[in-house]
Amino acid sequence: MTVYVALLRGVNVGGRGKVDMRELKNQVEALGCSDVSTYINSGNVIFRDRRAASTLTRELEQKLERRVAVRSLAQIRALCKRIPEGWGNDQEQKTDIGFALDEPGELLWHALRKDLKPREGPEWEVEVTARNVNTVRTLRAKMEAL
């Protein structure tokens, strides 16, 4: 079985898109996925399944009524290798990854915080669900531990 992460778009952002993580876990289990767990309240679900990512994306979006990016452990590992080791998300720098929803791939965005205006961030040219680099690295570790 393949280890996947499903990244839901627009979950618990600025008080909108509220989703209970326990209910989310139950909904993913109801689709037949195994070893399901969630990570933080931003719509990250790790699980095992035999189906293809494209099938899971379609079924999850229908069940959850939200846009979802599904990535395998192999894809997350490859992504993490592309991110420069010194890039982080801390007091000095901001690094976000935009997971494309309608096409394969991810977009990396990095800036020094001193160069940013308040509330400034990436402007993606495709529809994405974004996570900061620390979250992505933690998701990889949790996926590897499954």
What residue spans do the PLM features occupy?
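Surface-exposed, charge/polar-rich loops and edge strands
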Residues: 2-42, 46-146
